[in-house]
Regions:
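A short tyrosine-centered beta-strand micro-motif
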Residues: 69-75
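Residues that define the transmembrane beta-barrel architecture of outer-membrane proteins
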Residues: 138, 159-165, 189, 218-224, ...
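Transmembrane beta-strand segments that form the barrel wall of outer-membrane beta-barrel proteins
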Residues: 142-152, 174-183, 207-213, 236-246, ...
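Repeated loop/turn-to-beta-strand initiation elements of outer-membrane beta-barrel proteins
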Residues: 173-176, 191-193, 234-238, 266-270, ...
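Outer-membrane beta-barrel transmembrane domain signature
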Residues: 185, 246-338, 344, 359-361
Length: 361
């Protein structure tokens, strides 16, 4: 009751931020977003305060009546005047922006790197430099990685581990991440459409197991198709897509419907995911079936039909020194009964993991 009767005490306790821009733009609206949670900062959504800077950023802005605590500031140039931070197909901001603490992310923004303490009654000045995320031509990543997979095939080697180069290119409209590529076709804010391509390794070599001998090796191939990305409330991302064999080696394709959400734990960004993967009849037959001409007593003819499997996994990202970053991705695919029942299969699930240390240029 005492605090209610003495409102000036609130003014004494309230903190204030003054936000200035090192390089105010010649035109456009500059927007300040204030965050107090890593769960929303990681994908730059749902800030606790949003204000436009006066005079297009040439005059510092003020955020008043703040409680003491930990905050992070993001400032962006609203180039098209739509009142929101535009992002590309994979969720990277496509408008110039800047962060408190002179922080510049090397991947998903990390809250502790941009966060600062604000004490009761304190007035703190934050200066930010605006810069485009992609520069003039996007950025490249180069490093070393290791992939590890298990085989579901009867009598085959359980684990396969091999080193690979980790190469990537990230641009506003085009992204190449290892063996996958995307090109943006349509961006409507929370919904985006892209053309996609991916390299699919052959499922097996006949020398992998005596149960596969005489069936011939399965060829690598190139898939191509389309994908839809939808940003849902609370930071969930829904993706759906289909890719078909462009080289005609399997005459089939795969569809995918998945959900993913990013969390932060300290300096780690952790993104659990779950997906349903559809394998067309011809692709399932190519990778899991046994043609009648190749049947034998211990390997009867088998036609699995199309199949839907469940995939559960996660990706972990951590910024290291300067432009270096660490990426770990792992998933397990649970095979449906019509694939598990194949005479050349003796596993009910497949593990797949990828680890890399890369540098961004």
């Amino acid at each position: 009751m005492l605090a209610i009767n003495m409102p000036w005490l609130k003014n004494v306790e309230a903190a204030e931020l003054i936000i200035g821009i090192d390089n105010p733009p010649s035109s456009g609206t500059v927007i300040v977003m204030l965050f107090n949670s890593s769960s929303t900062f990681v994908d730059l959504r749902d800030p606790v305060r949003v204000i436009p800077l006066p005079s297009g950023g040439t005059t510092p802005g003020r955020i008043l009546d703040l409680a003491s605590g930990e905050y992070a500031v993001v400032v962006y140039l609203d180039e098209n005047g739509n009142g929101r931070l535009d992002k590309n197909f994979i969720g990277i901001p496509s408008e110039p922006l800047g962060f408190s603490n002179r922080y510049w992310p090397q991947g998903p923004p990390t809250y502790p790197r941009a966060a600062f303490k604000l004490e009761a009654g304190e007035t703190k000045t934050i200066d930010v430099k605006l810069q485009p995320v992609f520069g003039k031509s996007g950025f490249f990543g180069l490093g070393v990685g290791v992939i590890s997979t298990t085989s579901p095939y009867r009598g085959a080697k359980t684990w396969d581990v091999q080193p690979i180069p980790a190469i990537s290119y990230i641009g506003d409209r085009v992204q190449i991440l290892g063996l996958t590529a995307r090109g943006s076709l349509l961006n409507l804010g929370d919904f985006a459409l892209a053309a996609t391509a991916s390299y699919r390794f052959g499922a097996y070599c006949e020398k992998d197991s005596p149960y596969l001998q005489g069936m011939g090796s399965r060829d690598d191939t190139l898939l191509g198709g389309f994908a839809l990305q939808a940003r849902l409330p609370e930071g969930f991302n829904l993706s759906a897509g289909y890719e078909h064999d462009l080289l005609g080696r399997t005459s089939g394709g795969t569809g995918r419907l998945g959900v993913e959400k990013a969390f932060q734990q300290g300096l780690l960004t952790i993104s659990p995911k779950i997906a349903f993967n559809w394998i067309t009849d011809k692709l399932a037959d190519y990778e899991y079936g046994v043609p009648a001409a190749q049947a034998r007593p211990d390997r009867p003819a088998y036609h699995p039909g199309d199949a839907v499997n469940l995939e559960v996994g996660f990706t972990i990202f951590r910024e290291l020194y300067k432009n270096w970053q660490l990426i770990l991705s792992s998933s397990v695919v649970f095979l449906p009964s019509n694939l598990k029942n194949s005479p050349i299969v003796d596993q009910s699930h497949v593990f797949d993991s990828f680890f890399a240390v890369t540098r961004r240029f």
